[in-house]
Amino acid sequence: DDIIITTGGSEAVLFAFLSCLNPGDEIIVPEPAYANYMAFAISAGAVIRTVTTTIEEGFSLPKVEKFEELINERTKAILICNPNNPTGYLYTRREMNQIRDMVKKYDLYLFSDEVYREFIYTGSPYISACHLEGIEENVVLIDSVSKRYSECGIRIGALITKNKEVRNAVM
């Protein structure tokens, strides 16, 4: 019941934006990030606000204060790609909990693009946003089989959420 099949991960991102956001709403995204997020946001009338990660810090999640500097009444979501595209950075349990705490504190959506979850080479554990307690209704997970099977022409993706209102809006 929580899974909606889409024509690729890109359509899942667009559906997430269109179903959860209104024109002028803002999404905070750690950068560097997948370039097409911007196009999907524009299509939905939303605005991407970025918080910069640096190579010097290994592209780790910026401090919570950096996110909070950007949060305002128009902020409706945080978008992460885990592992990150293009850096490959894998968020730690501590970082995922920090994201969870911000989502909970400000009642935001967490759009979590997890299409690269099988591409982890460090031995570190992968933490899905769907496993973060206390924000189950806020999480919208994006998935795709294209990367997993090296078949980018196979346009099969999914939008996964426990939030019934979001699922109904998508359908």
Task: Locate predicted features.
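Short loop-beta-helix segment that forms the pyridoxal 5′-phosphate
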Residues: D1-F15
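PLP-dependent aminotransferase-like
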Residues: D1, L18-I80, R93
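Conserved core segment of the aminotransferase class I/II
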Residues: L132-M171
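Hydrophobic residues at beta-strand termini and immediately following loops
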Residues: T6, V51-T52, A129, I142
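Aromatic/hydrophobic pocket-lining residues that form π-stacking "cages" and hydrophobic walls in ligand
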Residues: Y37, I99, A129
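A short helix->loop->beta-strand "cap" motif at the edges of active sites that frequently abuts
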Residues: D25, A46, K105-Y109, I135-E137
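Active-site phosphate-binding strand-loop segment of PLP-dependent enzymes
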Residues: T54-S124
